[in-house]
């Protein structure tokens, strides 16, 4: 495992897209720089394997313990047996970290869990990311086929919203749209009772990924009133 050079860092998002897992938004350069603003130090690394794998490692100082290494949604392997070639390199480059947390996007199974244990990995007691699973949807069949695959109640609700005039549109990311989106999130927090980070936290996250061409804000509206929103990320 070696540090990426200046040109490789500039081309970082192209490199992670070539990883076996196809790339993860939390392995992008925008995410690394976003976390830098929140006291994590990003390190951009490349494996010494025959086909190099690009790995973003975040380092954070934990009082009383030392440095924690964190590989969000990575390293970018597609199969569990691709991990051993990377782990020793990660341990060396993350030193003197007291622990390294990895989150490879591999399919969960009893065999995979056993193999991870054999590599010396242990399931952490707390998940960093809220989502514990990834759903992969093949978009190639087209909109009609995707809609047909939904449950009848879901299709009914979508068509009902369309008949009533609800529209979904991309919107520019500016102070007004950020305020609107954050207000929607705060209202949802109040109903559901979950923890929500500050407006400034999300504003920086959205702005960095939008500037990198990796994010777009969408609003669902009816008669000029915004009903819902989502910031979609992509590589």
Question: Where in the sequence are the language-model features?
Answer:
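Conserved acetyl-CoA binding element of GNAT-fold acetyltransferases
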Residues: 65-77, 133
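A generic structural signal for short coil/turn motifs at secondary-structure boundaries
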Residues: 78-81, 191
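Alpha-helix C-terminal capping segments
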Residues: 45-48, 89-95
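Conserved residues at the C-terminal ends of beta-strands
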Residues: 72-74, 103, 233
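Conserved GNAT acetyl-CoA-binding A-motif
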Residues: 95-106
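Conserved acetyl-CoA-binding loop-helix of GNAT-fold acetyltransferases
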Residues: 80-91
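A conserved beta-strand-loop-helix scaffold within acyl/acetyltransferase catalytic domains
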Residues: 3-49, 53-65, 105-109, 114, ...
């Amino acid at each position: 495992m070696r540090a990426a050079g200046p040109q490789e860092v500039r081309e970082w998002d192209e490199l992670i897209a070539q990883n076996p897992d196809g790339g993860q938004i939390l392995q992008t350069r925008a995410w690394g720089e976003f976390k830098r603003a929140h006291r994590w130090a990003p390190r951009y690394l490349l494996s010494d394997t025959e086909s190099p794998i690009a790995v973003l490692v975040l380092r954070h100082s934990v009082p009383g313990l030392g440095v924690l290494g964190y590989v969000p949604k990575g390293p970018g392997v597609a199969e569990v047996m691709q991990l051993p070639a990377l782990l020793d390199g990660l341990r060396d480059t993350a030193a003197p970290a007291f622990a390294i947390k990895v989150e490879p996007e591999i399919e969960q199974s009893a065999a995979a869990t056993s193999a991870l244990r054999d590599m010396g990995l242990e399931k952490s007691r707390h998940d960093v990311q809220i989502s514990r699973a990834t759903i992969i949807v093949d978009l190639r069949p087209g909109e009609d086929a995707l809609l047909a695959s939904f449950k009848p109640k879901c299709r009914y609700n979508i068509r009902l919203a369309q008949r009533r005039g609800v529209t979904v549109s991309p919107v520019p990311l500016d102070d007004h749209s950020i305020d609107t989106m954050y207000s929607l999130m705060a209202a949802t927090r109040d109903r559901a009772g979950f923890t929500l980070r500050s407006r400034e936290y999300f504003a920086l996250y959205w702005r960095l990924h939008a500037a990198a061409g990796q994010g777009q804000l969408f609003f669902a509206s009816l008669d000029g009133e915004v009903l819902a929103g989502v910031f979609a990320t992509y590589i």
